[in-house]
């Protein structure tokens, strides 16, 4: 799978890499619902959103499977003079615990966990078992009350996606769905923004 993404970045077949932070992320940050703290960018690509959050005062860990994407992201972070606020890791998002908090919270660069996590188009590419591992790891690294935003395509007959009922099964009972905004891409494929909040007891 990682070779697939390397080739897309090599040949610049990356229409999602717009260089712009989605207005949904900007609105969440500007709303004040997320405390300025620690953020996790899952499937960070070339770092656009990690850089935006660092500019707003967050400490950020970004994870992506593509070496080329991470190399480009590191260049952008250095150019923005934000290397002290953004840590970029090439790896498997289902192993996010390793990158976000280390082997234990006591050893963590982010002791106490993550305040805000988001995923723009990574989760929907995972298979069912990987999605389970992802949610388990996410629940470990997020603080109680943390906000998680997910942008995902809806499933089609020949393409992976994420349906609302799957969100309910995978994320319950550790999370509650706070908001759902449906839409579509420029080709008319259905998509949605999910905003979930980790329950205090989980």
Question: Model-derived features: where do they sit?
Answer:
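Class I (Rossmann-like) S-adenosyl-L-methionine-dependent methyltransferase catalytic domain
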Residues: 1-40, 46-112, 126-141, 146-202
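Conserved acidic residues
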Residues: 115
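A conserved beta-strand element that flanks and buttresses the S-adenosyl-L-methionine
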Residues: 118
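Short catalytic micro-motifs in class I SAM-dependent methyltransferases
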Residues: 121-125
């Amino acid at each position: 799978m990682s070779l697939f993404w390397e080739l897309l970045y090599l040949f610049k077949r990356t229409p999602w890499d717009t260089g712009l932070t989605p207005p949904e992320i900007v609105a969440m940050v500007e709303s004040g619902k997320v405390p300025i703290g620690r953020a996790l960018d899952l499937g960070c690509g070339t770092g656009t959103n990690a850089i935006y959050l660092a500019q707003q005062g967050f400490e950020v860990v970004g994870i992506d499977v593509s070496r080329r994407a991470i190399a480009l992201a590191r260049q952008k972070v250095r150019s923005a003079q934000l290397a002290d606020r953004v840590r970029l890791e090439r790896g498997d998002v289902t192993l996010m615990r390793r990158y976000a908090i280390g082997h234990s919270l006591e050893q963590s660069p982010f002791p106490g966990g993550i305040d805000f996590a988001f995923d723009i188009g990574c989760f929907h590419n995972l298979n069912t078992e990987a999605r389970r591992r992802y949610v388990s790891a996410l629940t470990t690294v997020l603080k109680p009350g943390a906000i998680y935003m997910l942008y995902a395509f809806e499933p089609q007959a020949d393409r992976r996606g994420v349906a609302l009922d799957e969100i309910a099964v995978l994320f319950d009972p550790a999370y509650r769905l706070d908001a759902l905004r449906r839409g579509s891409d420029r080709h008319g494929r259905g998509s949605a923004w999910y905003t979930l909040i980790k329950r205090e007891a989980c």
